[in-house]
């Protein structure tokens, strides 16, 4: 049976894709067959008449995943707006059935699957005939989660608010990862210490522009759960 994890963040442009790529890369370097999936992506580039799923393309390149990155994303939009608005602008009805079909297709190819969210945890995927929130996708696939947060000023507030929302939605958070971490920045050091001391969730860091995660592979494997 495959194992999975969901990567979310405290907001947009925090570094979900970057962290996701490094996690998958770390596992694949130890011969773990780990794949990638994303339900909806906006802000795609158009090349030669085709939309390119930039996040997926980045992950595939960094983690050395073979195949077409676009196949790992159910809905790809050019406009750099939230998925529900992009769907409106393109007259597209986002379907949970298609998301499920694509997810299970990816799941059948890999032993481990890493699912990346869109924006922060409170993200409308569809406001059409059937309302879909990001947390609906997490719960349907019974995925635990990693929360990516920026290491800098304000992260205590945004991280705890994110965790509170996820607790209300009964989503299991396995790890907090502080991105852009600087070991010499007193704010970063204090933020990590505060979160570590006040939460019952492991807190790890990712240095800015790091090529690898300084997290033991065993710890990463532990947080993936059977799905």
From Swiss-Prot:
Q: What class of enzyme is it?
A: ligase
The protein's annotated pathway: Cofactor biosynthesis; biotin biosynthesis; biotin from 7,8-diaminononanoate: step 1/2
EC number, UniProt record: 6.3.3.3
Keywords of this entry: ATP-binding, Biotin biosynthesis, Cytoplasm, Ligase, Magnesium, Metal-binding, Nucleotide-binding
Q: Name one Pfam family in it.
A: AAA_26
Please state where this protein is localized.
Cytoplasm
Q: Give me the residues that bind ATP, please.
A: 13-18, 55, 116-119, 179-180
Q: Which residues are noted in the entry as Mg(2+)-binding?
A: 17, 55, 116
Q: How does it assemble?
A: Homodimer.
NCBIfam families per record: bioD
What is this protein called in UniProt?
ATP-dependent dethiobiotin synthetase BioD
């Amino acid at each position: 049976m495959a194992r999975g994890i969901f990567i979310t963040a405290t907001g947009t442009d925090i570094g979900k894709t970057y962290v996701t790529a490094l996690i998958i890369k770390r596992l694949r370097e130890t011969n773990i067959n780990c794949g990638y999936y994303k339900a909806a992506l906006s802000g795609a580039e158009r090349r030669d008449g085709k939309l390119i799923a930039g996040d997926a393309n980045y992950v595939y390149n960094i983690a050395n995943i073979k195949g077409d990155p676009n196949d790992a994303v159910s809905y790809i939009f050019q406009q750099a707006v939230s998925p529900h608005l992009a769907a409106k602008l393109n007259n597209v009805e986002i379907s949970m059935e298609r998301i499920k079909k694509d997810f299970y297709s990816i799941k059948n190819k890999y032993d481990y699957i890493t699912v990346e969210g869109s924006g922060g945890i409170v993200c409308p995927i569809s406001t059409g005939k059937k309302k879909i929130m990001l947390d609906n996708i997490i719960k349907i696939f019974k995925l635990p989660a990693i929360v990516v947060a920026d290491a800098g000023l304000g992260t205590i507030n945004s991280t705890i608010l994110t965790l509170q929302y996820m607790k209300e939605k009964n989503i299991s958070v396995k790890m907090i990862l502080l991105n852009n971490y600087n070991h010499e920045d007193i704010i970063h050091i204090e933020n990590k210490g505060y979160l570590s001391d006040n939460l019952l969730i492991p807190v790890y860091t990712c240095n800015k522009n790091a090529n690898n995660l300084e997290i033991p592979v065993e710890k990463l494997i532990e947080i993936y759960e059977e799905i």
